[in-house]
Amino acid sequence: REFADLLEADLDWLGLAADEGGSKGGPRGPYYQSERSAIYEEYYQKLVRKGLVYPCFCSRSQLHAADAPHRSDGNVVYAGTCRNLTPEEIVLRTARRKPAWRVMVPDETISFVDGHMGPYADNLAQDCGDFYLRRADGVFAYQLAVVVDDALMGITQVVRGADPVSYTHLT
């Protein structure tokens, strides 16, 4: 938290003072992801109940090999290797390796207007495929945490660099 407090002080100095959060407190806390696991679990379980989450047993080397030939941007498009495993296959694989958990993404184009970059359209299924929501060690992925946090904290405007613009439609 020491570094978070220093960052908050720097932002205050620049005139970018937050209304609430971190050391300031407020009604939408807790403000540190490490303290929000129960909140993420609640929303993760909603996706599980809807049948949108599945276990993935692929190692990084398997994912990298399955995506050959590799894209010039370095991104790996998940091929859906574990998406349709039978319950029996899941039990067998779980005995050998603890799974990470992915969310199923639809194969459709999503369009929005970015305040800086202008009109943007992307098909997440083709751009990255089903993505991780939870690592094998139980830690929730950024992609879940940021969506839940933005929604619950009333975030309406987000400034991002060009590299994560493809995550915008997740929020």
What are the functions of these language-model segments?
Residues 1-71, 166-170:
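N-terminal Rossmann-like or analogous alpha/beta NTP/dinucleotide-binding catalytic cores
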Residues 61-170:
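Active-site cores that bind ATP or allylic diphosphates and position pyrophosphate for catalysis
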